[in-house]
Amino acid sequence: LNQYKKLIPNGNNLGIKISYIEQDKPRGLPDAFVLGEKFIGKDNVAMILGDNFFYGQNLTAKLLDCVKIRDGAKVLLHSVQTPELFGVAKVDKNNKIIQLKEKPKKFISNNAITGLYFFDNKVVQYSKKLKPSKRGEVEIIDLLLRYKKNNKLSADFIGRGGAWLDTGSIEDYYKTIAFVQAIENRQGFKIACIEEIALNNKWIGKKEINKSIKFYGNCNYSKYLKNLI
């Protein structure tokens, strides 16, 4: 955690605010909403898993639409060839989720639930009431089922041309590196350069970019930042 704080402290260099809360032991994903109750306040909230990689030309527009949710929850789905390895969802014609299953033995759908979730403010109270599973943690699938029970769970899709990669294993981590490297080398642009994103959104200016260049030192990333200004 200290390494993350050193790399991205409070977000001032990006024109945003960043806070850190540490989960002292594994208690499951929904526990994050309990720990972050004061931080969340009366707002709605999104959760993204740190080992998930998302890429797509239309992804930004989808995310901006997802954060507008005011009542209920929404998940991002992606079609996979091995649904038995993932939590999957079956949806109706209106993208309402009608069935959820974690690593189903029988085919339900090939729509895997990715590690990107959007919730209304009820998520904090719902998370507090979850009971741990056999492995001793509260489960994200149980939280989603709570919303589904109330008919408040919908979905959107990454869609064709988009990518979702899980970097939870060494093999998948290197596959993701190769994917990013291939696209960046071909296009000449960085994927998810946070300083570039902040600059394009006018959250920061040349002053902050120059500070980042000094922080990173003499490297290719600094050279890329120099070309932005």
Which functions belong to the PLM regions below?
Residues 14-17, 41-45, 50, 69-73, ...:
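Short coil/turn connectors at secondary-structure junctions
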Residues 56-84:
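Conserved donor-nucleotide/metal-binding helix-loop-beta segment in metal-dependent transferases, i.e.
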Residues 47-50, 76-79, 159:
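Short beta-strand segments
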Residues 46, 64-67, 96-196, 203, ...:
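Catalytic-core segments of class I nucleotidyltransferases/pyrophosphorylases
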Residues 1-49, 53-61, 169, 209-215, ...:
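Conserved N-terminal catalytic core of the sugar/cofactor nucleotidyltransferase
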Residues 89-91:
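A structural signal for short hydrophobic beta-strand segments in well-ordered beta-sheet cores
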Residues 21-23, 76, 156-158:
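Conserved beta-strand termini and adjacent loop/short-helix elements that scaffold enzyme active sites
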Residues 199-229:
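Generic C-terminus detector
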